[in-house]
A protein has these predicted regions:
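Catalytic histidine-centered segment of alpha/beta-hydrolase-like enzymes
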Residues: 98-112
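Histidine-centered active-site/metal-ligand motif
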Residues: 74, 85, 106
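Solvent-exposed polar/charged
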Residues: 64, 91-92
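Conserved alpha/beta-hydrolase "acid-adjacent" motif
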Residues: 79-85
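Alpha/beta-hydrolase
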Residues: 1-61, 68, 88
Length: 112
């Protein structure tokens, strides 16, 4: 998007695709994204981040090599990355614990 205002509105619309409908609050999201972009607005940054994520090689070896206490938190209703992704991540990290949050989607919201 060309302007910060356009990006904020786009972020609000996009968030609706994978947000928990019970916790989707346009005013709260507008405030959140405004604060976020006032700190660091980078036109096109979201698309570059998405492209980088899609081109990243497997993280399996890196996860298996972790040697720190780890809690994987994942929403059971995540439509962007299914709960299986969270389970697999916890399975790959030695000694990791998994916290599956009932009713939560991909967004980590204040209500949780």
């Amino acid at each position: 998007k060309e302007t910060m205002e356009e990006q904020i509105e786009s972020d609000i619309v996009t968030r609706k695709l994978w947000a928990n409908p019970d916790w989707y609050d346009v005013d709260q999201l507008r405030e959140f994204f405004t604060e976020l972009h006032e700190r660091a607005f980078v036109p096109g940054g979201g698309m570059r981040q998405f492209g980088a994520a899609m081109r990243t090689p497997s993280r399996v070896e890196g996860l298996q090599a972790l040697d720190i206490p780890t809690l994987v938190v994942h929403g059971e209703n995540d439509t962007l990355l299914s709960i299986e992704h969270g389970r697999r991540t916890a399975e790959l990290i030695p000694g990791a614990e998994l916290l599956e949050i009932e009713g939560m989607s991909h967004d980590f919201v204040y209500q949780v």
